[in-house]
From Swiss-Prot:
Name of the protein in its database record: Presequence protease, mitochondrial
Localisation per UniProt entry: Mitochondrion intermembrane space; Mitochondrion matrix
Stored InterPro entries: Metalloenz_LuxS/M16, Pept_M16_N, Peptidase_M16_C, Peptidase_M16C_assoc, PreP_C
Gene that this polypeptide is encoded by: CYM1
Annotated catalytic residues: E108, E181
GO cellular component, one term: mitochondrial intermembrane space
Cofactor annotation remark: Binds 1 zinc ion per subunit.
Residues reported to bind Zn(2+): H105, H109, E206
Length: 1063
């Protein structure tokens, strides 16, 4: 399950961190808001609930209805929209953590391990393959826990709502579930009662994985220092092992009661249906006093709080910086309380101001701190943050020297006084005004840009403040706040922001807080030593009888995990609920200068989406690993010969919804040994501003500056390469299974080989190499080596062609009929201009040569059957075993996808997560890429998981051979198919309609054929593909990411290739 930090990220630059509040649904229904309002008179009693507030939210095309359950006091929020069939439900609880043992987090897991109505071991995971939901989760925040799902199927909604309510209000909370999901002592070898006793548990290992992420570690230690009263709800691994089972049961009894519950529904299902179900559950409960119990930050609890805190933290072993320059430090100002309803407008102004000061190339803090190399990157807590009752503004940096860390506050104050205030005082002459206009334009676009997860987004935007007493309806009324802001800005201009700063950051008595993390070379070893010490203390306190009990309980738990359960009590959909005919979008086609134009005519609420793609098989393969950097440079370097980057950034934000450039390798849907390279352009705009996208495409493509003699270009590239090198360790820690899979797959197909180069461990190594050269050779490396390569890539991508027909870009449009007609003319003008300004580069088909070398094993990839360990200092590991599968159009592809679901839910979930203690694991089949991937995530024993992967073939064959006796049943097969169709039939973004045809060359006919194959897969098909691909297929390609200090693989072991990633 996910853990949340409620903060406004600097990555949300265009939308101020409230993107999920700014999406308008398409008004396609004939039902007016007046008709909806008439259904909900104030004071009406509906199944034990009384309507307290009804509010139209026209910016979102919905009506908000707030109700209270008369008997228990539970609040319910319903968002009625006839336009969206993707219905959402959630139940949330206020759950203040009493300590750092992780009791709210572990309870979140264990509630989903069986209930009185559904007494099966893990109804949550079992419902994942008995449903057509497109979202199911449970999440723990700082002081709240919530359980949301989304589905387009009304019967499915009813089933899931029943399971969720039973799970949270009447869970079994068995001791076995606590041991499995929380923590336990267990013999390392269950066949040997004398084997060493170790710690195990899903949440325990999840949080060990979190603590391996240095950004998370900095963030959580910062939170503990400034807001210690909240405690660490996720759990500190050092303290999780102090949690008692009785504490878990007591915490549930105290907090999981309707009086402490906030329930939420969204969509087009009638409210009365939801209330009837809720009332059935709640009528057996009495009323409790509602205790919001909002905890306070340290600045309010203690007038003499410690305002300058330093703690020790981990090194970034992949950083090129010396240890003494790996300090992290931040200065934080407390600027308000986000729970104060009267201050909602001030919070919005702060979001705008934070974006103005912190986001993008134009922001003063980026220019003064990053570009001028005071620090290399912003700290994770940088920007505006709203955590419970604390609204704060933080400037923080990574990779500082001790002296710079000590002087950070003076440096930041100097930027405020010498740069920001003078700029604000310029009034209408300030460049800030253009940026304000750009920010407002992005808000307007986000109102219009329809996303399929709209309901989940609205829920996520209100739940953290709602559980703490803020009226959620007020939080949704964005139009009112936005209009007030526009009037205020029109009247007062930039003075409104100067006033904000004068009243807070620049005011001497404003509470502030400095937090620094000192790099500790022995940090990882100390964590390991602390764990060993804790374990030894617990073992020393055990009697021989205790050890016997531990062994017996572990055996019993293992047997229960293996035991086949009767899950007939759980509700389920069937394959009959899946339409045999898929939903397809009509596409039109035309020619533009003999190049294909694909058109999807649909109402897009005043927006137009455009894409272009070009075959770049001619590009020299030596340039592939440079391509992500090149893509990044197009919108992040010094700009173009016509427009500097500061102006270009504003132009993009003021005139469009964004323009992007990227390169990708695509697998041939008929043959996985074939691939093609595509250069893709994307854009989105209001339909009356669409010409700007083509103008920007052309200018950026043809005029981006890569001049070695231009010092601004060199400086920008220096900063960019440094930024890309930051936090690579954290990225791998968060998605280690993806990196392990990518590395394994790179030895199977040419497409996956390229993917690893441009987005996997190969790219991580490449960026590390660039940073190492930057440290040793300085800017000369950029001038003499890197910039000439980037310039040559630009020349090839703009001017090069695959064949003598001078074929270039193909195009696609998604928009209403009028907009598409106008854009056809714009595309022709763009294409003519591009052709007229290009000088053809004669190119060979380099990609064909690479494919040939790959398929004949001439790229040096064959490890001769050896497994690979990517040695990184993580507390937990990630394992991958890859095998070659089948092409998209192969009949085998459908059977392999079904097989992957069966093995995941009917075998691997039990052995990898429940028994081995990993956070997750399974088997996936990439239908487009053709690779099978066994994987584990945040795994304490990745080598054990690898063996489990290898054993899975015999398990699968045994289940199919013994289908009459302890084998896989027709119901199991049905559930596997249901799981697949959760993704196949999930709502899609309107801009992606037709994208499979355009980008992957997968037609509606191919999709329909594959759909029917999914539905028609038999056990005979599964047996055939198991034998063909798992038993007799390609050799096993194994990759493990983890710490060899723990794994202890001998470097001389001929079965292993150990790869150490360092700067």
């Amino acid at each position: 399950m996910l853990r949340l930090a409620n903060r406004v990220s600097r990555k949300d630059s265009g939308n101020l961190g409230i993107a999920q509040l700014k999406k308008r649904l398409l008004a396609t229904s004939g039902v007016s808001q007046g008709e909806i309002l008439s259904k909900y008179p104030i004071g009406l009693n509906m199944h034990g609930y009384v309507i307290e507030q009804v509010q139209p939210i026209p910016e979102f095309s919905l009506v908000a209805v707030k109700l209270k359950h008369s008997r228990t006091g539970s609040e319910h929020l319903h968002l009625d929209t006839p336009n969206d069939k993707n219905n959402v439900f959630s139940v949330a609880f206020k759950t203040n953590a009493p300590d750092a043992t992780g009791v709210p987090h572990i309870l979140e897991h264990t509630t989903l391990c069986g209930s009185f109505k559904y007494p099966v071991r893990d109804p949550f995971f079992k419902m994942l393959n008995r449903s057509l939901s497109n979202f199911m989760n449970a999440m723990t925040g700082h002081d709240y826990t919530y359980y949301p799902f989304a589905t387009t199927n009304a019967k499915d909604f009813e089933n899931l709502m029943d399971v969720y309510l039973s799970s949270v209000f009447e869970p079994l909370l068995t001791h076995e579930s606590f041991m499995q999901e929380g923590w336990r002592l267990e013999n390392s070898d269950l066949s040997d009662p004398k084997s060493p006793i170790i710690f195990k548990g899903v949440v325990y290992n999840e949080m060990k994985g979190q603590y391996s992420n240095s950004a998370y570690y900095y963030w959580i230690k910062f939170q503990e220092a400034i807001y210690g009263s909240l405690n660490n709800s996720g759990g500190n691994p050092n303290e999780i092992t102090d949690l008692r089972y009785e504490d878990l049961v007591d915490f549930h009894s105290s907090n999981y009661h309707p009086s402490n519950a906030k329930t939420f529904t969204y969509g087009n299902i009638e409210l009365v249906n939801h209330l009837n179900k809720l009332n059935e559950f709640f009528e057996s409960f009495g009323s409790r006093g509602i205790r919001t119990n909002v905890r306070k930050p340290i600045t309010e609890l203690n007038p003499n709080y410690e305002s300058d805190v330093t703690v020790k933290g981990p090194l970034d072993t992949m950083s090129s910086r010396p240890i003494e320059e790996q300090y992290k430090s931040s200065i934080t100002w407390v600027i308000g309380n986000p729970l104060d309803e009267s201050k909602l407008y001030d919070v919005f102004k702060w979001k705008v101001l934070s974006s103005l000061l912190c986001d993008g190339h134009n922001s003063p803090f980026y220019q003064e701190l990053i570009e001028k190399e005071y620090g290399e990157d912003f700290a994770v807590n940088y920007g505006l943050d709203a955590t419970t009752a604390l609204l704060s503004f933080t400037i923080g940096l990574n990779n500082l020297s001790l002296e710079k860390a000590k002087n950070l506050e003076d440096k930041v104050r100097g930027i405020f006084v010498e740069k920001i205030i003078p700029e604000l005082q310029k009034g209408k002459e300030s460049g800030f005004n253009d940026r304000i206009e750009a920010i407002l334009h992005q808000i307007e676009l986000n109102f219009k840009n329809h996303k399929p997860e709209f309901g989940i987004g609205l829920l996520s935007s209100v739940v953290s403040t709602w559980v703490n007493g803020l009226n959620p309806v007020k939080s949704l009324q964005i139009d009112h706040i936005l209009n007030r802001f526009k009037e205020d800005y029109k009247l007062n201009g930039l003075k409104m922001f100067q006033d904000l700063l004068d009243e807070s950051v620049l005011k001497d008595d404003t509470p502030k807080f400095k937090f620094t993390m000192e790099p500790d070379e022995s940090f990882g070893k100390n964590l390991t030593s602390q764990e060993t010490e804790r374990l030894n203390k617990k073992i020393e306190a055990l009697t021989e009888e205790d050890k016997e009990i531990i062994y017996k309980r572990s055996i019993e738990l293992a047997e229960k995990q293996k035991k086949e359960e009767d899950v007939s009590a759980l509700p389920t959909l069937t394959v009959k609920d899946i339409p045999r005919e898929g939903d397809f979008y009509p596409l039109d086609f035309a020619d533009i200068n003999s190049k294909k134009l694909q058109k999807r005519i649909v109402d897009t609420n005043g927006l137009i989406y455009m894409n272009a793609t070009k075959d770049i098989s001619y590009l020299p393969s030596k340039y592939y690993e440079y391509l992500p950097l090149f893509d990044c440079c197009l919108t992040n370097l010094a700009g173009t010969s016509k427009t500097p980057i500061t102006e270009l950034e504003i132009k993009i934000q003021k005139l469009t919804g964004g323009v992007t450039f990227n390169v990708s390798a695509k697998t041939d849907p008929f043959d996985i040994s074939k691939t093609n390279m595509k250069f893709m352009l994307s854009g989105m705009a209001l339909k009356d501003k669409s010409q700007n996208v083509y103008d920007l495409w052309f200018e950026i493509l043809t005029q981006t500056k890569f001049d070695s003699e231009d010092e601004q270009v060199v400086d920008k590239l220096f900063t960019l390469v440094k930024n890309l090198g930051q936090n690579q360790m954290n990225t791998i820690a968060d998605s280690g299974h993806s990196y392990a899979n990518s590395y394994s797959n790179s030895q199977l197909t040419p497409t996956k080989y390229i993917h690893n180069l441009i987005g996997g461990i190969g790219q991580v190594s490449f960026i590390s190499d660039l940073n190492r050269k930057l440290e040793t050779e300085g800017r000369d490396f950029l001038k003499k080596e890197l910039l000439p390569v980037l310039k040559d890539i630009q020349r090839h991508l703009v001017n090069g062609f695959t064949d003598g027909n001078h074929s270039g870009f193909e195009y696609s449009l998604v928009g209403d009929s009028e907009s598409v007609i106008k854009n056809e003319k714009m595309i022709k003008e763009f294409d003519d201009l591009l052709t007229a300004n290009s000088n053809r580069v004669a190119g060979t088909n380099e990609l064909s040569s690479l494919i040939s070398q790959f398929n004949s094993n001439k790229l040096g990839l064959n490890n001769n059957g050896r497994s690979t360990l990517i040695d990184l200092p993580f507390q937990v590991g990630y394992a991958s075993l890859a095998k070659l599968g089948a092409a998209y159009t192969s009949k085998d592809g459908a059977a392999l996808r079904v097989l992957s679901q069966l093995l995941t839910f009917k075998h691997l979930h039990s052995v990898i997560r429940e028994a081995n203690g990993a956070y997750g694991g399974g088997l996936s089949f990439d239908g487009l890429g053709g690779c099978l991937n066994f994987y584990s995530y945040r795994d304490p024993n990745p080598l054990t998981s690898v063996q489990s992967f290898k054993d899975s073939t015999s398990v699968a064959l045994g289940k199919m051979i013994n289908s009459e006796n302890n084998g896989w049943s027709p119901k199991d097969l049905q559930e596997a198919k249901l799981t697949i169709f959760q993704g196949v039939d999930a709502p899609s973004h309107i801009s992606s309609q037709g994208s499979l045809d355009f980008l992957e060359h997968i037609t509606d006919e191919m999709r329909q054929e594959r759909r029917e194959r999914f539905l028609d897969v038999t056990y005979e098909d599964l047996k055939n593909v198991t034998e063909k691909y798992l038993l007799n297929g390609s050799q096993d390609i194994v990759t493990v990411i983890g710490d060899n200090e723990t794994l202890k693989i001998d470097s001389s072991d001929a079965q292993w290739n150990i790869k150490k990633l360092t700067a």
